[in-house]
Every structure is written in C-alpha cells, then in structure tokens.
Amino acid sequence: MDIKGQFWNDDDSEGDNESEEFLYGVQGSCAADLYRHPQLDADIEAVKEIYSENSVSIREYGTIDDVDLDLHINISFLDEEVSTAWKVLRTEPIVLRLRFSLSQYLDGPEPSIEVFQPSNKEGFGLGLQLKKILCMFTSQQWKHLSNDFLKTQQEKRHSWFKASGTIKKFRAGLSIFSPIPKSPSFPIIQDSMLKGKLGVPELRVGRLMNRSISCTMKNPKVEVFGYPPSPQAGLLCPQHVGLPPPARTSPLVSGHCKNIPTLEYGFLVQIMKYAEQRIPTLNEYCVVCDEQHVFQNGSMLKPAVCTRELCVFSFYTLGVMSGAAEEVATGAEVVDLQVAMCRAALESPRKSIIFEPYPSVVDPTDPKTLAFNPKKKNYERLQKALDSVMSIREMTQGSYLEIKKQMDKLDPLAHPLLQWIISSNRSHIVKLPLSRLKFMHTSHQFLLLSSPPAKEARFRTAKKLYGSTFAFHGSHIENWHSILRNGLVNASYTKLQLHGAAYGKGIYLSPISSISFGYSGMGKGQHRMPSKDELVQRYNRMNTIPQTRSIQSRFLQSRNLNCIALCEVITSKDLQKHGNIWVCPVSDHVCTRFFFVYEDGQVGDANINTQDPKIQKEIMRVIGTQVYTN
C-alpha cells in the first residue's frame, strides 16, 4: 500500500490483514490532521450529483497540503471516424488531473493540469492541445475566483437539492441549461437564444442541429452514412453518436464552444463543461494559439496548426505532429499515396497555383528558422528534398531508424518534409481491404473522409430532408494534395478552375464514370478530355495486355497516375442536373466517401452508372462491410 497517499472514498474498505489496517489508519490520521476546505467538498459532491460517482476520483496526500482530482470526461459522443482520425479512444474517458491546495482550494495557487487517456500512451496529441486550452482557461478564471465568491454561486444551487427530489424533477424537463444529468433522454442545448422556446420533444430533434453535446448521454447505434447495415456484416461505423460542433457560418454559434459555463455548480463542473464544449471543435482551432482556422471551405476533419510562424515553431516542439515512423508502420499505403500526390502537385506546371499549402518545415540544424517557408517559396529545393524521400516500400522492409539515417545523409530536409506531408493531411484515409468495390477494377481503393463533424452533421440533416445519392468527381492527382488539406472546394471562376464552368458555379459531378475519368486525366499540360469511346478502348486494351505486376500490388509502382473520387451528394433542388453532368453549388452538400487510383493510363470501367440499382447495391455492400478500427 502506498504510505504517501490514499484515495479518498466515501466508504472505507475493511481488509482482513491487520498490518494493512494499521497502515491505513496511520495514513488516515495524518490526512485528518490536514484541513480540507469545505468548498472543495461541495464542488466534488456537485460533480457526483450532476455526472456520476465515477466521474471524479480524489487522491489526498497524508503529509503535504495537496490533493489530486481526476475528472473523467466521457467522449463516447464522438463519431467513430472522428475518434479514429484524432487518435483517441472513444470507449475510454479523457482524464483531467488537477492538483489543488487541500486547505485553500480556490484561494490557493493555480492548479496544475494534466490531460491523458490511461490506455493511450503514444501519440496523444489531442491531449496536449486540450491541456493548453484548459490551462489558458484556468489562468483566466483564477484571476477572479475565490472560495467566498464561489460559495455565493453555489448557495443558489443548494435550494434545488432537497430530499423531496426537486432537483430530479428539475432535471427531467425544466431546464436546458443545467449541467449534464446522469442519464438524460435528450441532449442539452446550450444556446441562450433557445431558452424557453424548446420543449423536450424539440430537444430530441436538436440532435440534428449544429450544437455541442453532453458527454454522458446514452446513444443509439447509427451508421456513419445513415444507411441500414448489411445483415451479413457490421457497420462501417459501429456507433454514430453526438451532435456536431457549431457551424462557422453563424457568429453566435461559432463562438459557442468558447462560452464560459456557469459557476453555479462549482469550479469543477465548470471546467468539465468547458472541456466538453471544446472537444468536439478542436479541429476548428489552431492547436497552438487556439485561434479559429480560416479556410475557404470551412474547417477540415483533423486538428492542425495555423500558418503563423510562431505557431509552426511551437507545433514542432509541442509534440502533436504525427510521427512518420508510426504512420508508415500502420498505414504505409496511405503515406505512399500522400507522397505521390505531393510529387504530382510539385511537378505540375500549375504548381504556383495548386501546390497549396506550401510546406512550413523547421530547419533541423537551426530550430529558430524555417527551411521551407510559404513566404519564401523555393520549388527547386523542395523538389530536391522530395526526391531524397525514400520509397515507402523500402521503409517497410527495414529498420525505420536506419532508413531515416540514410535519408538524412541524402538530404537533411527529406525526413522533416515527409513528416510535414503526413501531419498536414487533414483528411482521414484508410486503405480498403479485399471487400472493395469490384466494378472499379483497381486494388488502390481508399475510404476518404474529409468533412469535419459540423459539416457531416449538416450533411446528415440535409439528407434527412432531401435524400442523397452517389456520383463521381474527377480531378487530376496534382489537385489532391490541396484537396486533402483544404477540402473539395467550388473552384468555378477562380484561379483554381481548369476545365471551365459551362453549367454555372459549383462542384462538378457525374453519375457516369467515363465523364469523371476524362476530367481525372486532365492536368500537367493535358487539356483535352478523352471521349467515352477512347476511354472504353483504353479500358479494354489495359485489361487484355498481360500485366507485368500483380493487380494486388500493395504500393504504387508508377508516377503516371489517374484518380477519381466517389462522393455522396444531397439530392435537393440546389443540385443542378444537365444530363449526366451535375453541378452542386452548395459545398456542404457534397462529401467524399471513396477514392480510387489507377496507374500507367489505366482506367476503370467507363460504363459505370451510379444510378444503376446493381451499382448502388454494391456501394451499399462495401459501406455495410467496411469496418475500420484504430
């Protein structure tokens, strides 16, 4: 037994070992000699009452005036694809460990804060970001907090905690602003404009609204794309739960996650509520300065650093950047694809337009300068470093440390550039297993999710109203370096436009594969779209020529690549259909789902029509059987 400290529980366990009882008694008497501030007790009880007994654990030290409080934040409300992309375990709470003065509590020194997941030892970059946020929040609150001030706030709450159960009736349906109940039947909407306007049934409908969510609600199992699961297989997403973060289009909503929760229930409940507000929107803010990202197409799925140089330097020292070794070990094919996209963009005649973002890479020999700086672009030096990045195939066949040493000898900027390529990707990409879309005729098939929680939720809301279907989007591989980091944007009438906009402004799609395959081959000086007959001939020729390598090849063998995306699109009146060319002017109504890559001029079947019931059934089969895990 640890003689230095004890866990403070309501009921002391009775052990049979006399010596153990003796040690516990000595330790308990030491702790009893230290004064424990009653406001601390009150705040702990508030956490237990509002959340659960298991939401807080306390470690008291017998000889020093310190106490550690572990606050457990339930994150099961995160979607499966979000938690996977963010590298967090949604089945395990995030723990906030705060160390206070036992006798002074809020009148004492500002508490230290640690953020962790017990089973997530490596690469918990999200915890570092959340720690910075909560440390900043606590520092601001500590300027005016005191035990006396909090006591007056807490006394307002005590009148509700009566033996007659008034608080239970209150929580059952009167207030939409109270902290999270233990087992609510509906989410808590915290927008002040909705106060008094919504009843309980409307609150349930609020699941579809752009609001943050209680971390303790019990959630039904819903698939990621809103489709019924295949009876023979599991869902793509075992649980889809929770509400999205605020929409950035509304000033009121966009600032919602930074609203300061009430102190009426104590400081511990306040910081838990603030953490719950911030977690779903971490991708919308710079991981260093906590300022909101500004992108043409809104935020992306993965958290990222902003472009400020100071933030870039801090980002490299903060430890939130993905380790290249880990990514190569767990997703080598995805890293291989990312490098290929970067190379295609860098070698394009249009690189000054489409190679965006340009890398921000700290010089390994001088950590105070940028070796690659967006303000001072040097494409030749960048090309030299990229040429020194060894093939991902080689990286998987030997010791990563040895391979890194070889790269460092070739070019000291090669490995830092590889790290940037991996960490700057803001989309979630997973190589599909053998249960892929067979009609696409390529082994290089990927699940591609780039929509942040807010956009995905807006998409689901629109889908419930208008329905959805699938369509192809063709774009040359040189464009995908930017798409993975900035999203699928409306390029019509902008410098990004390459093909014209004969049918108006919007994202161009087609249910017919031959049309999108034509667009996917355009770029790098090729500005004539092949006809359907040419594509069919090419497809037939590529499938009759003996293959020099297996179609099941794990890695890309060629630099001559074509690619095409399969997107889900809302079938509202906004979707303009001009025969087999569709234009969607609302970017929120298009979400990428799958991505396909072809080598050496290969193309898939040019006769595919996503509106064919057989094709739709095949898409549904893959969605139903594709289960990806951490």
Swiss-Prot record:
Give an example GO molecular function: NAD+-protein-aspartate ADP-ribosyltransferase activity
Mention one GO biological process in which this protein takes part, according to its record. Answer: protein auto-ADP-ribosylation
What is the species listed in this Swiss-Prot or TrEMBL entry?
Answer: Mus musculus (Mouse)
Q: What is this protein called?
A: Protein mono-ADP-ribosyltransferase PARP6
| Post-translational modification note | Auto-mono-ADP-ribosylated.
Q: Is-annotated flag, keyword NAD?
A: yes
Domain PARP catalytic intervals? 394-620
EC number from the UniProt entry: 2.4.2.-
Enzyme superclass (EC): transferase
The reply on keyword Repeat is no
Write out the function statement from the record: Mono-ADP-ribosyltransferase that mediates mono-ADP-ribosylation of target proteins.
Q: Which UniProt keywords apply?
A: ADP-ribosylation, Glycosyltransferase, NAD, Nucleotidyltransferase, Transferase
The UniProt entry's sequence similarity note says: Belongs to the ARTD/PARP family.
PTM annotation (ADP-ribosylcysteine): residues: C237
Q: Which residues carry this modification: ADP-ribosyl aspartic acid?
A: D600
Q: According to its UniProt record, which reaction does this protein catalyse?
A: L-aspartyl-[protein] + NAD(+) = 4-O-(ADP-D-ribosyl)-L-aspartyl-[protein] + nicotinamide; L-cysteinyl-[protein] + NAD(+) = S-(ADP-D-ribosyl)-L-cysteinyl-[protein] + nicotinamide + H(+)
